[in-house]
Amino acid sequence: MKSQQLKLGLHRKNRRVWLDNRALLKGAGFQVGFKYDVKYCHLSRVIFLSLDAEGARKVAKKNGTDPIIDLNSTKVGWALGDCSEILVEYNQGIIEISPIEEKERSIHELASAFKTFEDKA
């Protein structure tokens, strides 16, 4: 599993998730033109994207070949709440998007700083 931390955007008064990391998307199987479904879970505060040949959505493209997933609706804010950053976890055929709370963000920042310190030592 690979993951990345992103800012939750705002577009036309709605919360927006913009995924454009080619390596992570392709590594999870989300290729340009592949279909997928979105499940918004308000109670668990998570959004699931799952590859599905009969899916309602299609992976878009940028620059002709790079995959993009753009989620922009009131459902995004409804599911993720009022957060400023999200954690995106990429698994084969499934992407999980969840909010990063202030406490979690501090832990991630400390872990990142510690890793940087170890790398320099």
PLM regions and their residue ranges:
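Short beta-strand-centered segments at strand-helix junctions
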Residues: 13-33, 56-83
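N-terminal intrinsically disordered, low-complexity, charge/repeat-rich segments that act as generic
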Residues: 1-3, 15
